[in-house]
């Protein structure tokens, strides 16, 4: 991954010498896709991300050693409609912001007495995609007041800070150069309403955390570890930034 990301980073540095006008209203990455990629996402029979949703359905019903399952506590997956729109969110018990992946793993350890699913594992991506898929079409609506406000401020600061050998911030691409061309593709706003996504470059499913790490690698910066406090707070900021955009998971991206 690093070789490809470094090559991309060099191209980014060249492209960002151009002048561009920022877009302020939230626009889904779907609007920047090629027609054939849009068609792939729109067709549930062809959308490869649905394979992870199906895996999530199997895991939802699977009993742990203590006899519990996601379904025994929560009912059918459809009962999760609306849940994904609110994550990441403040957790009183954890004393911090918790992502949906972390909530799933807390249920694993506390309710099912099972080990956590590793980040970026098919199992965790599958369950996350299943829960998010139930909210498809509903607007993202994370809490932005109270303790969440402080976390969002830290995420925003990270988003706007230049870093890495290329000295670029997230805003360098996803605010200042939205609509510009990079390696034959159009730079989007970097909205996260489609996550977890099936990314064609990865030939697999990926979380917001994985995407953040990949972008950091592309600008030759130290990647944030998935599940770290900063990564989760950055995701919260990103979801607040896209407030109102409809959930698309599992989206397909380049």
Label the predicted regions.
Residues 1-42, 46, 55-58, 116, ...:
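N-terminal export/targeting leaders of redox proteins
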Residues 113-141, 211, 221-253:
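C-terminal capping alpha-helices of c-type cytochrome domains
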